[in-house]
């Protein structure tokens, strides 16, 4: 059976030499033309629509049709939405408990950073190291505060026999304003390496020590009370008798003011200035390098009182500006 050409106005037999198979039909090569304009086409530039060949300009364009929003269409859309929600919720229930998705925000970033810092502190043992440092830290010395014992006036006969109460409490000074014993050791505070003073080996410089003028009220009153003041070397030389004083200066009389016992149990010691110091307060004294300061009394770890031999001024001075000095044995008249 011979094959016929698919073109309607041709209808002739198609031989194998001129045969063209396309769109499920057999065509003559010269009969394979555009249905609208009649332009000859080939296998590269044709477009088929409804099993008919078309060129590109005349190819029927598919345009989306506009459908009215009817109740039926609304019902279909609602069903589609419900089906989508059901499927999504089923997936959500399936994934529940397996993982949690959390969005990163500043608060979460801060918590993650804090957790990382805590983990590093625990891993490196910072807390244990601080605890060990606190264990080896020297404990503060807290002097006991017994019942204050008033000091009776002393004369030259009873000077060599101090009372047992004063000898037992060698680290106490007495203040008439506070009515009893006052501990000279202040509360130590933890400082930095910049506050360490290498001269006295204590924490805190001389300028940083608390100045308590009330502690000096009784000492200054006793020194300024008598018309003549004497100091002995810190070796503990006994005070002179009244006869020797009257023979040296017949017009001067030795009164018997209340004596102040130093924390070391002696009548004062002498020091020598190794630096210049300018008084920063009214209860301090100024001195130059090389000055001899006598009749010294220790107030606390950083301060003491004494009299400068050169200027005869009495007051407070920093302990890290002086060093112990040995005076010749004997009596030295200051005023």
From Swiss-Prot:
* Keywords attached to this entry: LIM domain, Metal-binding, Repeat, SH3 domain, Zinc
Q: GO molecular function: any one?
A: metal ion binding
Question: Where is the sequence biased in composition, kind Basic and acidic residues?
Answer: 128-142
- The residues bearing each Nebulin repeat, given as ranges, are 66-97, 98-132
Compositional bias (Low complexity): 242-260
Q: What is this protein called?
A: LIM and SH3 domain protein F42H10.3
List cellular component terms (GO).
cell junction; focal adhesion; striated muscle dense body
Domain LIM zinc-binding as annotated: residue spans? 5-65
Region annotated Disordered, chain positions: 128-151, 233-264
């Amino acid at each position: 059976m011979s094959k016929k050409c698919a073109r309607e106005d041709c209808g002739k037999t198609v031989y194998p030499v001129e045969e063209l198979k396309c769109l499920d039909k057999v065509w003559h090569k010269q009969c394979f033309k555009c249905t609208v304009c009649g332009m000859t086409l080939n296998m590269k530039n044709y477009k088929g629509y409804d099993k008919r060949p078309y060129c590109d300009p005349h190819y029927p364009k598919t345009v989306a049709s506009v459908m009215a929003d009817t109740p039926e269409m609304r019902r279909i859309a609602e069903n589609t939405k419900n089906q989508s929600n059901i499927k999504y919720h089923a997936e959500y229930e399936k994934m529940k408990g397996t993982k949690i998705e959390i969005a990163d925000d500043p608060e979460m970033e801060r918590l993650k950073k804090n957790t990382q810092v805590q983990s590093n502190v625990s891993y490196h043992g910072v807390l244990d190291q601080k605890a060990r440092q606190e264990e080896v830290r020297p404990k503060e010395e807290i002097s006991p505060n017994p019942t204050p014992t008033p000091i009776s006036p002393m004369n030259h006969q009873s000077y060599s026999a101090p009372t047992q109460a004063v000898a037992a409490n060698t680290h106490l000074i007495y203040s008439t304003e506070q009515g009893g014993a006052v501990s000279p050791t202040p509360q130590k505070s933890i400082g930095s390496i910049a506050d360490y003073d290498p001269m006295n080996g204590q924490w805190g410089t001389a300028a940083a020590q608390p100045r308590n003028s009330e502690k000096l009220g009784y000492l200054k009153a006793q020194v300024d009370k008598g018309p003549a003041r004497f100091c002995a070397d810190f070796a503990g030389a006994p005070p002179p008798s009244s006869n020797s004083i009257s023979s040296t200066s017949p017009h001067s009389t030795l009164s018997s003011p209340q004596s102040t016992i130093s924390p070391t149990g002696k009548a004062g010691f002498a020091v020598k200035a190794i630096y210049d110091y300018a008084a920063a307060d009214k209860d301090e004294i100024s001195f130059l390098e090389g000055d001899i300061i006598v009749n010294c009394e220790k107030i606390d770890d950083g301060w003491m009182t004494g009299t400068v031999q050169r200027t005869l001024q009495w007051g407070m001075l920093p302990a890290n500006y002086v060093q112990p000095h040995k005076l010749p044995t004997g009596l030295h008249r200051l005023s």
